[in-house]
């Protein structure tokens, strides 16, 4: 049993998207482009189209500029680099259904729901129609539209200010520890996402959900893909 909470009951929950609600992984695309050679694929992703390179697009850099710049550095890899943008839709996996079920519980209970995600402003419109649950959010802040990425505290403040949220009654859920730490430093109630059952227990402890399991979600676990990639 958790200790009784003396602080006010939270009134809003903010979700990260990639790795929490959406399974995103560039390997879904690049396994097709490196058939039978996972080692070469991993080298390409680690040394060419790196996470830091992708994060610059999440911060607002145009994809055309990103592809051109990287292709100039690695002309022998130009077609593979261009595929990251041209075939970006193939990096998307399924919704992480156990977490979607937790989100559905919150939605049906009337809690204010928001999303805060490191994501390119150019590619998010590709993803949005694929995941109907995104319509449950009162607001979605996409880093590429603002020009700031997590864990920069300015992005969290942008969310709080735009929607009039009190950090002390706002819950933030993210699978990235640095993003969770940044939220806590602003006084937000932050939860490091591990899996859907663990998340649900934390939300029960906060008084946001009742006891009892959501419809079948717990058995499925609810983490990201086995490769562990996610939008930041």
Question: Can you say where each PLM-predicted feature lies in the sequence?
Answer:
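N-terminal helical cap/lid subdomain that shapes the substrate entry/recognition surface
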Residues: 3-101, 108, 120-123
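Generic structural signal for small/hydrophobic residues in well-ordered secondary structure
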Residues: 16-19, 60, 106, 115, ...
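Secondary-structure boundary motif
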Residues: 72, 76, 105-108, 129, ...
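Proline-centered loop/turn at the N-terminus of a beta-strand
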Residues: 112-114, 189
């Amino acid at each position: 049993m958790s200790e009784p909470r003396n602080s006010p009951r939270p009134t809003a929950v903010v979700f990260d998207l990639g790795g929490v609600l959406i399974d995103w992984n560039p390997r879904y695309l690049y396994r097709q482009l490196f058939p039978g050679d996972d080692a070469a694929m991993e080298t390409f992703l680690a040394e060419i189209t790196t996470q830091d390179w992708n994060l610059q697009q999440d911060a607002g850099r145009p994809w055309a500029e990103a592809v051109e710049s990287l292709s100039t550095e690695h002309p022998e890899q130009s077609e593979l680099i261009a595929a990251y943008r041209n075939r970006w839709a193939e990096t998307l996996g399924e919704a992480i259904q156990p977490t979607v079920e937790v989100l559905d519980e919150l939605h049906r209970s009337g809690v204010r729901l928001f999303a805060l995600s490191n994501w390119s402003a150019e590619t998010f419109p590709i993803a949005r129609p694929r995941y109907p649950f995104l319509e449950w959010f009162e607001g979605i802040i996409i880093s590429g539209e603002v020009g700031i990425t997590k864990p920069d505290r300015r992005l969290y403040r942008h969310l709080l200010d735009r929607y009039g949220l009190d950090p002390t009654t706002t819950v933030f859920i993210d699978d990235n520890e640095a993003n969770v730490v940044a939220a806590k430093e602003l006084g937000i109630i932050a939860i490091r996402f591990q899996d859907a059952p663990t998340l649900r227990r934390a939300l029960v402890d906060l008084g946001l959900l009742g006891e009892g399991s959501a419809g079948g979600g717990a058995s499925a676990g609810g983490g990201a893909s086995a490769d562990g990639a996610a939008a930041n």
